[in-house]
Design a protein with these regions (language model features):
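Conserved Rossmann-fold cofactor-binding substructure of NAD(P)-dependent oxidoreductases
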Residues: 47-66
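N-terminal Rossmann NAD(P)H-binding glycine-rich loop of SDR-like oxidoreductase domains
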Residues: 5-25
Length: 209
């Protein structure tokens, strides 16, 4: 029997390659979409769940029968941030269903104790905190929720996302961003690889091309 994973944000920039990558690795997928026609995926291994990520019944339906959760939920920088609200609901539902593995993404500008960022990356993080203070505060709250959750979580910090670039070598670092951009394909590949990789459980690695 195939392991089944739930995907939130699977039609966005970072997530649109996730479902196909997961199927190639032998997983079955349950993917949340607001509008099913937005997804052009046509695969018997992919089940589309229509709904809103803020709705508890939708999240319960999405996660039922799953072994792990991948969250790439995204929204415009100027929108009222919902990251922590949705992550809190996902965590609660995962606990109810006894799902342990969670893999998510956040911005590389999120500072964490122990970071050893270059001067340029430090300046970039400061600029983001000034320009998008509400969003960055919500992303920090999201991290704190995961840290307190007792789940096997990994929160991957990303640079600028390039949608149409080909797959390249993925650079990884625990303490600083190793590049300025990454392709959507490589984000998907790295996230799928983490489902059974314990190396980054409870950690916030940086990745880039």
């Amino acid at each position: 029997m195939k392991n089944t994973i739930a995907i939130i944000g699977g039609t966005g920039r970072a997530g649109k390659f996730l479902a196909k990558s997961a199927v190639k690795k032998g997983y079955s997928v349950r993917m949340l979409v607001r509008t099913p026609k937005k997804s052009l995926l046509d695969d018997s291994n992919i089940t589309l769940i229509q709904g809103d990520a803020r709705n508890p019944d939708t999240i319960l339906s999405l996660l039922s029968g799953c072994h792990a959760v991948i969250n790439t939920f995204g929204q415009p920088n100027k929108a009222v941030p919902l990251y922590s609200e949705i992550t809190a609901l996902v965590i609660q539902t995962m606990k109810e269903l006894e799902i342990k593995r969670y893999v998510g993404v956040t911005g590389g500008s999120l500072d964490i104790e122990g970071d050893k960022k270059s001067i340029l990356n430090k300046i970039g993080a400061i600029v983001f905190r000034i320009l998008y203070s509400e969003m960055m505060e919500d992303k920090r709250k999201e991290l704190q929720l995961l840290q307190a959750s007792k789940l096997d979580w990994t929160l991957i910090r990303l640079p600028f996302v390039k949608e149409n670039e080909k797959s390249k070598v993925i650079k990884e670092d625990d303490f600083d961003m190793p590049g300025f951009k990454i392709s959507s394909r490589d984000i998907a590949r790295f996230m799928i690889e983490q489902l059974h990789n314990p190396s980054y459980i409870g950690k916030t690695p940086f990745i880039a091309n």
